[in-house]
Amino acid sequence: MTLAELQDAFAALGEPKFRAKQVFAWLHRGAVSFEAMTNLSKPLRETLDSLYFINKPTVARKQISRLDGTIKYLWRLRDGNCVESVVMQYHHGNTVCISSEVGCPMGCKFCASTIGGLVRRLEPSELLDQVLFSQLDSGLPISNIVLMGIGEPLDNFDNVMRFLEIVNSPDGMNIGMRHISLSTCGLVDKIEQLAERDLQLTLSVSLHSPDDESRSKIMPVNRRWPVDTLLSACRDYFAKTGRRISFEFTMIDGVSDSPEQAQLLAKKLAGMGAHVNMIPLNNVTESGLHTSSRQAIRRFQTILEENGVTATLRRTLGSDIDASCGQLRRKYESN
């Protein structure tokens, strides 16, 4: 529940609004029972316990990188389904990457998360739990959130928007919108809706190819919203929000790494203030795809920068603990 919804629920019980704030604060400190909320009267705690339950995911598996301390969680949800989240440590703070769905309907060829398709969309509380319990279990204060785990966040638009409202609340975890990144494979209608909300988060668009022919081969979504249609929506988003878009670009040998594609990408992103985040392909056996060579990646980056487009190579974290999103869930469920 949002704080406003919780206040309405307490008003219906004849309780003052400040009681809702107390419960909201308890929940965001990780309370897993109403009995633990000691600043509430016992009768109120009993009433709440009879009307509601507090959900808590359990750790099905946890991996800690020996290389950099990255922590990968596989959470078992109330219905037995599993999702992943990853805690990454940086000099500027700790970031958690969370999932938005169980499985994914988008079918991107290079991604393990989409194998098996969509099972269901996560509730706002299940999104929040990944942040909260990753923080509590790891002991690391979370300052940044990226919605780049399993699932397509904009396919779960309403629940993700409710989650953002809750996690941004000053009475809860109070994580600022500018510390939140949301990734999409390019659902144009939802990008347009997101622009109208002007949330000041960072939008990351999984582009992965600048031309329709190669992008359609690896990303089925391109058949509905081709590259130029997607980039037009991105330009409108930038104009309305003033927020620079980060374009995710997986470097795939023979698919998306040619000098000609680098030139085309630079041309199509001109004037957008865009940033390209180049990502070496993580191995997904079923895809039959391979990452680009270091030489090809350096050449691609140089061409972008020579044409006025900023580009960085994503730092690889947790490479020894199933770094590819969706891999841990697949291995766990296949055993």
Where are these regions (language model features)?
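Auxiliary Fe-S-binding modules of radical SAM enzymes
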Residues: 1-81, 235-244, 249-335
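Short linear Ser/Thr-Pro motifs
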Residues: 65, 99-100, 113, 183, ...
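A generic beta-sheet turn/junction motif
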Residues: 66, 78, 89-91, 186, ...
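A short loop-to-beta-strand scaffold at the N-terminal edge of the catalytic core in hydrolase folds
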Residues: 82-87
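Canonical Radical SAM [4Fe-4S] cluster-binding loop centered on the CxxxCxxC motif
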Residues: 89-126
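Conserved alpha-helical substructure of the radical SAM core
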Residues: 114-144
